[in-house]
Amino acid sequence: MNPSLKRRGTMQENETKRVKKVCDYGEKCYRMNPVHFREFSHPHLESILDNHTSGGDYPIPDKYNLQKKLITEQLDVIIEKGFYAPRNNVQNNPKQIENKQETYRDRREGKNVEPEASSASHQKVPDKPENTKIMSLNNEAKIKTPIDRGGVVKEKSSYSDYRPIIPPTRRVEDYLNVVRPKGRMAAKHEASAPFYIFYTTITAAKETHSQPFSITFQEILDRSLGELKCSLQINFMVELGWLLAQYYFAGYSEKKLTILYGEDSQDLRTISQKKPHVDAHLVPMATPFGKHHTKMMILCYEDGSLRVVVSTANLYIDDWENRTQGLWFSPKCPELPSEAMPHDGESPTMFKKSLLRYLNHYHMPHLTYYVERVKRSDFSHINVFLVASAPGSHFDMDWGMTRVGSLLRQHCCIPPEEQLQWPLVAQASSLGSYGKDPKLWLTGDFLHNFTKIKNQSQMLSSPPTLKLIYPSLENVKQSHDDLLGGGCLPYAAEAHSKQPWLNSFLYQWRAASTNRNRAMPHIKSYTRVSKDGRKAAYYLLTSGNVSKAAWGSMNKGNGALRIMSYEAGVLFLPKFVTNEDYFSLEQNARNRLIVPYDLPPVKYTDGMSPWVSDYLM
């Protein structure tokens, strides 16, 4: 047997044996993301596959006629990825499976797969609206591209052209599980000052639905914040149907949208052909060990202002339902006067300069408009530092863990005599490979940079304690989604087997104080907490996990910091946010810093083991 086919067969066997929960949306599921079909079962789709015996059309029942196109594409994804083995002997033959997967890949890429198709079959048929799926909502919002009398498509309009709000014709409550009242986000955002930190609403935890610090994606697009003109979404995983549905329900289905993404997708590759106002670009990576892992938004408004969102959530439904995510939602940054210089409107934290440095690192002409908008905006009131990572070897202190260390060395106010009494609490959704000894990186360069302080002694001394919050197997079992709650925690058993010493650093996910105890964390955050648990020296909210790929590793030869991934986060320092030396963590404090987990952290008990993704195999 062909070795690659054997590996594929093994993978398919593992996928079909995977513990799957039935999708809550049932026959109304509109999802296209392969991750969703890997994690959830869809009986109505599997029934169709059970009755499918050839590479031709699927035997889709008449009752699904209105969503036939959507179901066909969903079935193609399931077969192509090997997520379901149909209950008939013909399709269980490995050679038949391989042939079918090639057929479905061809069909998804628009190739002709019908051997005896008539000439009529090659004619383009106008898309028909589909009644019951969110994917069909996008058809209602298609841009009608002008055509001149000679049949030539006219050039797309520029960013300066106004695109109207298009009120949705469907009820948002019929499609989204948690819907907050419209028109109230501006007041809610203002009340979140001076931190502007939000945690995503948990669908299964009703207590979170009305929390002042909880947020839904629809609230990010709420019109009380201003009328959107265009937006830039920078992310890793993007489920296009879900994202466009969010814009549709906000009335922004015709507004220009640019997407930078890290995980390849056929839908994203071809979206501009279907929707000329949506521009999507895959960010190439130099190494498979690096990821385009940043989660950021730049929202540009019709009045010339903009807002920046730095988040931990991918742009697909699972990340916005029962997972703990965090985001910083900036205040509005107004447009500078026309005579202003590009460097005007800078903040005390140099946020504008840092954001431009990050955007320019892509070297993408598609970002020119957003770079210019940032240059023309006033960031003078921004009180956080942008902390980003970008692939490459860096000799300055502008990126990764040396950026963190440099800022803390200037501004962290922990007294030197108390240095060992303030542990570093690092909370992540995945752990890296650190080697046989923690001193090689974890309690070496990483801990050294994340625990720097002002007036630090140059004398060598023991580092502060490191407490790593990462869910145990027991934590995941009690999650809202049972074992599937671990779908956002990709730490592997093989990696853990090589560093058993890590167990002594691990602490459980406990978040009863924010009603997120059963919502597994995809958030990543770092802080230093006083011995009595009443104060924090800083708070870093970021996409970066505790890994070398995210924060970098030092090249001992030339001193360069080697980073493999794109990441973005914001660092909150008390001096800039509250004009004090520390953040208060006390319940009734006036400017209380709300962290998503319980303090003090609870250590793993004897016999506990960290969650590993192999449990889903």
Give each language-model segment a name:
Residues 1-121:
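Cys/His Zn-binding finger modules involved in RNA regulation
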Residues 2-10, 17, 95-98, 102-617:
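PLD/PLD-like phosphodiesterase catalytic module centered on the HKD motif
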